[in-house]
Amino acid sequence: MPRLRLPDFLGLGVQKGGTTTLHQMLAEHPEVFLPEQKEVHYFSLHYAEGPAWYAAHYEALAPGQRCGDITPYYLFHPEAPARIKALLPTARLLVLLRDPVQRTLSQLFHSRRLGLEPLDLEAAIAAESQRLAGAEAVLARPDGRHGSHQEHSYLSRSRYERQLPGWQALFPPEQLLILRSEDLFTDPASIWQRLQSFLGLTPVPWAGELPRANAGSGEQATVPPQLRAWLREQLAPTYRAMEAGYGLGW
């Protein structure tokens, strides 16, 4: 029985942190194969389908190419670290982290645009803990899905210091690359070099044009200053932990 061809690397997140741009950038490299469908969601929504289902997304892989899966829900999904370790123990893991307050607001506006959030900003954040209650038990099942865990996890997804340790406990440092989303857009050439080195790709010069994806519509300018300040206060432990433990500041 032939060995299944499965991803060499994964983009774990974060949602609203530039993973669409990351996907477009990496897809330009001749040694990289990515499915046309950016978010495969095998380790989150389709785990019950089995590895053969996952491998089917990579049937068009050419000899010598490295393949990946960029699904930003993985970083936040409580079962993803162990599932990935079991199937892909040597995979390289990419993480883009955005300013926590900016990320929270971006997800809120994204959910509202898609019709997934009927509440206003303040009410949606206030309802989050109740909406997410019991999610981990549901998600422990191979076929488990929890709509609010995926769509209404505004503050929770931005608490990076609660998510990263689960990955670091299972994967050695050399398999995990953590980058600031902002650097992807302000210094793409440098990030491009780091990505190629981390993934073991033949260096290709950066073309100099960054794909534009999911551009905002200025909605964040409408956020009341007091709400933004409150969010910063709520996420203060995250800012401190990321600066102290990872050298990432916002």
Which residue stretches match the model-derived regions?
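PAPS-dependent sulfotransferase catalytic core
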Residues: 1-77, 86-133, 141-149
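Generic recognition of short, well-ordered alpha-helical segments
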Residues: 21, 79-82, 162, 189-190
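Structural motif corresponding to alpha-helix initiation and N-cap regions
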Residues: 48-51, 77-78, 161, 225, ...
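Generic structural signal for well-ordered alpha-helices
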Residues: 51-55, 81, 164, 239
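CE4/NodB-like, metal-dependent polysaccharide N-deacetylase domain
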Residues: 54-63, 87, 160-175
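Acidic, metal-coordinating catalytic cores used for nucleic-acid/nucleotide bond scission
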Residues: 72-76, 156-157, 183-187
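The conserved 3'-phosphoadenosine-5'-phosphosulfate
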Residues: 100, 165-241, 247-248
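Surface-exposed cleft-lining segments at the edges of enzyme active sites
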Residues: 139-156, 215-227
